[in-house]
């Protein structure tokens, strides 16, 4: 399965590059003015979902390439807290898994939580409308959204143990549909066979 890391903000700033995001996380960029000269929000307040989350590990290993995160970054207790904090704090930038930022009332998963703005991210040196993508499942699957990582199931129990049954369920059609509906891109897409007649 594939999951994306999203950044959500309440400012009018809509796009960022991976390089800018790295500089925010390492503390080189500290103010919204560094990103958008017209911004009046002052210093960035960057929040993560949990001090031990996979999102923080991904940020250190893959985005910052082993560099330390800035000491000014804060970790809250849950993804819901990050969304609530960002929606109420104008200068906040929240970093959470893309599956948490989806609009739960939209069964198509084509919209995001309306209380925050989800930023589009570009792998290029300059973010434009044409090269920046939001973490929609299609862009995660095609790897056009650059902040993606794979999710694996690792088991070391005997083949007949309970964890093996869970793994088989999750990798089967029903399990992959559950993963799809949770906002994560499944490893295998459910197949639908359609028989089309040439004659009427």
What is the predicted function of each stretch?
Residues 10-200:
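Exported/periplasmic ABC-transporter solute-binding proteins
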